[in-house]
Each structure stands twice: as C-alpha cells, then as structure tokens.
C-alpha cells in the first residue's frame, strides 16, 4: 500500500529565505510565486494609489493606502502572507514596520494573465474569511471591476467607464481612466 504523500507546509520564514528579488505569496502554507507586473498593471496600481491617497488626504482621514509590495499577514499562524496590489488600512494598530497584521479594510487586486484563479477564487475566499471588508478585482483585459462588500454580502460588476462607489466611504467613487 502506498503511503499518502503529504504536501510541504511552508511558513513566513520560507518567504523570508527566498533569494533577493524573488517575490511570492503564502496561502494556507503553500507558496505562490509572482511574476513581475507589466506596465498596464503598474499604471493601474499607481492610479488607484493616487486616487485613494488623494481622497484620504482631502478628508483628513485616518486610513492609509499601501501599494505593493506591502506585506499583509492575514493571521497569526505564519502560513498566510500576501502582497495585495492596493491595501487600505484604517486601524493604525494593525500597521507595523513589517507591514499589516490582520485584514486590511479594503484590498484591490489587479488581474494578470497568469494569476486569474488566484484573484477570483483563492484570494476571494481567503480575504473574506480573514475579515477584509471590501475586495475589488480589477480585470484590465475585460475592462471590468468586480466589487465584493463582504459585510453586506454583495457582489457587483462595473465597467471601466462607470463610477464605482467605494463601500468603506459614503462619498467616494472611482472611475478608471
């Protein structure tokens, strides 16, 4: 009888041991390597960082916006580490020198061709169970934004030419230019 093969369970220490320049995320003890983002991806990250940051500054808000690479430790068991494209954190006690301990309030992921299932399925489930309040999946190929508001248990889709209301702020919406 063949013995059952156990898959290795990795921790944050394995992520820290990666060679310089190599980026990966850790979800439930499994390492997912990340390819370098393309120009369109980086432009979208910059756009969202600027729009959200400007809004927070205008409102003298307490939240902070962090673009990738920024470490998010979703729980304390050291088997979940992600680098969302955009993280908005409203609880200053979650922010440390190493990143964010616990769920950000709002996460935006920009879909790349090689990571669609990560953003649409794996991270969707992980972010919901970790306590993220709002999760946007921005798909440049489809020119669509899928918005999950976990507290209200809603999902809505918007095209890039529509204003997308931000659930964690009552008076803020974003239209992708």
Regions found by a protein language model. Name each.
Residues 1-177:
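Gly/Pro/Ser/Thr-rich low-complexity, intrinsically disordered segments predominantly at protein N-termini
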């Amino acid at each position: 009888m063949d013995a059952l093969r156990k898959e290795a369970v990795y921790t944050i220490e394995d992520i820290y041991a990666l060679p310089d320049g190599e980026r990966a995320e850790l979800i439930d003890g499994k390492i997912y390597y990340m390819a370098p983002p393309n120009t369109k991806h980086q432009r979208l990250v910059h756009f969202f960082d600027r729009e959200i940051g400007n809004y927070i500054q205008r409102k003298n808000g307490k939240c902070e916006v962090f673009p990738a690479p920024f470490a998010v430790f979703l729980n304390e068991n050291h088997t979940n580490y992600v680098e969302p494209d955009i993280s908005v954190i409203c609880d200053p006690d979650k922010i440390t020198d190493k990143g964010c301990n616990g769920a950000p309030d709002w996460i935006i992921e920009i879909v790349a061709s090689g990571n669609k299932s990560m953003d649409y399925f794996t991270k969707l489930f992980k972010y919901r169970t970790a306590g993220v309040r709002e999760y946007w999946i921005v798909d440049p190929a489809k020119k669509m934004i899928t918005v999950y508001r976990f507290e209200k248990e809603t999902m809505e889709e918007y095209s890039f030419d529509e204003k997308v209301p931000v659930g964690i702020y009552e008076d803020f919406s974003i239209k992708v230019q």
